[in-house]
Amino acid sequence: MKAGLRTVRLELTEPLRISRSTMSAREAVWLSIAHEGVTGHGEAVTSAYYGLDAARLERLLAAAGADLARFPGPESALGALRAGEWPVDDTPPAVTAAVEAALLDLAGKRAGRPLHRLLGTSEAPVAATARTIGITSPAHAAAQARALAASGFEVIKVKAGSSDPEDDVERVRAVRAAAPRARLLLDPNGAWSPAVAGALLPRFAGLGVEAVEQPIAPGDPEALAALAARSPLPVVADEDAVSLEDVRRLAGRVHGVNVKLAKCGGVHAALRIAEAIEGSGTELMLGCITASSLGLAPAVHLAGRARWADLDGHLLLAHDPWTGIGGEDGRVRAGELPGLGVRPRGVSREDVA
């Protein structure tokens, strides 16, 4: 197997402000793995939060790509990955996820089967995805919500964590008025103290918010579990639910966990998490970070397994260089093309390697 890299810049349609940062663009590193005339693709994106800049991603992906030479094919490399034998233990989960995605794309193309079929799901998953509204004025949030509802979005996620919590309340109130039938999710990205969260959550419940992600700062899962026990609306762990061990500690103690493939290490890591929470009362949310359709595609093939799908990262881009998972009408769809089912924009189905 032979690997190659390409780094591109992904611009957002408009800056996305959350409680800890504002983002207008990020770099994506595309990994291609070629074997016997077939090529698989995966994507890793930069993240200041996880300490991953483009140079580090390029170095780590190049090292993983060079190491592929010891495997006879993608199937054996995937077996080693699933067994935890490869890549090395200190490889960041985002890098492991990108390598796994390229291998799964390659394996699926070699088998002539889409990823969801390789994972045992016969029907191509289709799911209503949340669409994110960042920290912005109530008027702008309302205009965005109105447009999203008109486009078919049934689920809207509102970012919170303003310096004045009343601004968050007013933003959610404006979104609720503009999209009265929408299901609302709230995400402060850990901005509140337990006391502030305890005071605010009943108010958001009164506005019909369906669930809140990571209301308090990560690092104290006991406090998060205690808040969930008394919260009037479901609490979903995100930054406190990174690894399988994190999730096991929280299973049955929070209402949901947000699994992002770049955070946990990829498709098979996500499946292990889903298995760990089964029957515990803790439900699965599939989330993402802002990326292209190539980066989102592996999660879309898992979307039928989740209570909540928040797979809109590609929809935040001014130009998505890949296509194949939908989402513009509020629903993401896994395709029936072999592998991940995506292709570079402007390339026909017949030309996909």
Label the model's feature ranges.
Residues 15-20:
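Short, P/G- and charge-enriched loop/turn segments at secondary-structure junctions
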Residues 117-231:
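Metal-dependent enolase-superfamily TIM-barrel catalytic cores that perform enediolate-based chemistry
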Residues 1-12, 23, 36, 289-353:
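Flexible C-terminal active-site loop/helix
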Residues 40-42, 127-133, 154-158, 184-188, ...:
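Hydrophobic faces of well-ordered beta-strands that scaffold small-molecule active sites
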Residues 31, 37, 99, 112, ...:
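Conserved, mostly hydrophobic/aromatic
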Residues 5, 33-35, 39-110:
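Metal- or metallocofactor-binding catalytic centers and their adjacent structured scaffolds
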Residues 58, 62-65, 96, 100, ...:
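Predominant activation on well-ordered alpha-helical scaffold segments within soluble catalytic domains
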Residues 208, 219-226, 230-234, 241-331:
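Shared catalytic-loop signature of beta/alpha-barrel
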